[in-house]
C-alpha cells in the first residue's frame, strides 16, 4: 500500500507550483501519492507564506490542529517562506515538526525525511542553492489543460515592506532552453494554457545554451508562443519597473498572450510609493497602462494594494482612489499594511488608527467590487473565447471555463468539452462570475 502525503498551501501561485513539485518529488523518490484528507496521510506538509502576519500565525495555529496525528506516526513538515524566515525557531515553537525546508530546498525533501528517520531528530535545510532545485525535479505531471511553469526565483527589488528577498533570495532565472523544454513537455500532455511564474517574472534574464547570450522576458514569450499546442500564455507577478518597451510591443505581435495583466501598483501616492521603495510614480504606472491599452483596448487589469502604510494621510489615500478610478481595475488583492520583522518598513512610525485603516480598506474594496460588476455587465451579450477547465463549482451539472480576461463563466455543456477552447455567448453577469451558453457553429 502506497504512502500518502497531504499538502496544505498558503499564499501565492508560486507556492501552488512549489506544492505540485513537492508531490512530484515525493512520488518519484519515495512512492508517495497525494491525498486531500489529512486523516489518511502518512506525511503532512505545510507550504507557507509570510507576506502578512496573519498568514504566518495561521500556520502555527494549523500545526496545532494536526498535532494529534503524531500519535499514529504521521510525519509533519513545514516549507515555504515562513520556514525560510523562521528556520530552527519552528522546531522550538512546535517540537513535533519533523522537517523544515525553504522554497529553494524542496527538492531535498526525500533526503531530509531519510535523515529524520536515520538520526531520530528534526531536520532543517533553509539554504539558498540558487537554481539547483530545478535540476533535481522530475518531469512535470499534470491533469487538466492549464499549468504553471516557474521561470525564475527570488526578487532583488527590496521594497521596504517585503520579506520575499529574505525568504526566497535574490533573482535567479532558469536557463532559456530549460523553460522551453518544460513547456513543450506540458503541451505534449494536453496543456493548452501556461502561466509563467516568478516573484518578479518580467525581470527574467535566462542564459541561452552555452553562449554568452541572455534572453529577456519578451524573447521568452515569443518562443513559448511558438510551441505547438500552447494556445494561451499568462504570467505573474510582474513589476512596473521591468515593463520594457519590448514587453509592451510583444502584445502587438503575440496573440497567444492574453489580454489580462496583474501588475501590482501597491499605492497611488508618490510619497508612499517612495517610502515603499517601489521605484516609480503613479503617473509612470498609468503611462504603462495607457501604452498597453493603445495596443489592447480590452486589457483587463488587476493589482495589489496596501492600505494604511506608515505615514499614509487621507490625501494619500484619495490619490490611491484616483488611480483606481483612472485605471479602472477589475480585480484586486488589497490588505491593511502588516509590518514584517526584518524589513525597513517595520521600523517606520505608524500613527494611523486601525479603524481608519479598516474604513479605507472597505472603501477601496467597494470601488473595486463596483468596477467588477460594471465590467461584468458590459460582457453580457458578447461572445467570449473560453478554455473549459472542468465542472462548475457552483453546479456540478454544468461546466466552467475562463475567458482571456480571466473571468470565470459557468454554462451548461457536455463534459467532452473539458480541456477545449470554445466560444460562449454571455447571458448573465453575477457578482464575481458570468453565465453563458455555447455558441453552435453551423
Curated annotation (Swiss-Prot):
Catalytic activity: N(6)-dimethylallyladenosine(37) in tRNA + (sulfur carrier)-SH + AH2 + 2 S-adenosyl-L-methionine = 2-methylsulfanyl-N(6)-dimethylallyladenosine(37) in tRNA + (sulfur carrier)-H + 5'-deoxyadenosine + L-methionine + A + S-adenosyl-L-homocysteine + 2 H(+)
Enzyme class: transferase
TRAM domain location: 377-440
Positions bound to [4Fe-4S] cluster 1: 12, 49, 81
GO molecular function, a single term: 4 iron, 4 sulfur cluster binding
Native organism taxonomy: Bacteria, Pseudomonadati, Pseudomonadota, Betaproteobacteria, Burkholderiales
This protein's GO CC annotations: cytosol
Domain Radical SAM core, chain residue ranges per copy: 141-374
Family: Belongs to the methylthiotransferase family. MiaB subfamily.
Localization per Swiss-Prot or TrEMBL: Cytoplasm
SMART domains linked: Elp3 (SM00729)
UniProt key word Oxidoreductase: no
Cofactor(s) for this UniProt protein: [4Fe-4S] cluster
Species in which this protein is naturally found: Delftia acidovorans (strain DSM 14801 / SPH-1)
Name of the featured protein: tRNA-2-methylthio-N(6)-dimethylallyladenosine synthase
SUPFAM superfamilies per the UniProt record, alphabetical: Radical SAM enzymes
Cofactor binding annotation: Binds 2 [4Fe-4S] clusters. One cluster is coordinated with 3 cysteines and an exchangeable S-adenosyl-L-methionine.
Annotated residues for binding of [4Fe-4S] cluster 2: 155, 159, 162
MTTase N-terminal domain ranges (all copies): 3-118
Subunit structure: Monomer.
Domain of life per record: Bacteria
Protein role: Catalyzes the methylthiolation of N6-(dimethylallyl)adenosine (i(6)A), leading to the formation of 2-methylthio-N6-(dimethylallyl)adenosine (ms(2)i(6)A) at position 37 in tRNAs that read codons beginning with uridine.
Keywords tagged on the record: 4Fe-4S, Cytoplasm, Iron, Iron-sulfur, Metal-binding, S-adenosyl-L-methionine, Transferase, tRNA processing
EC number: 2.8.4.3
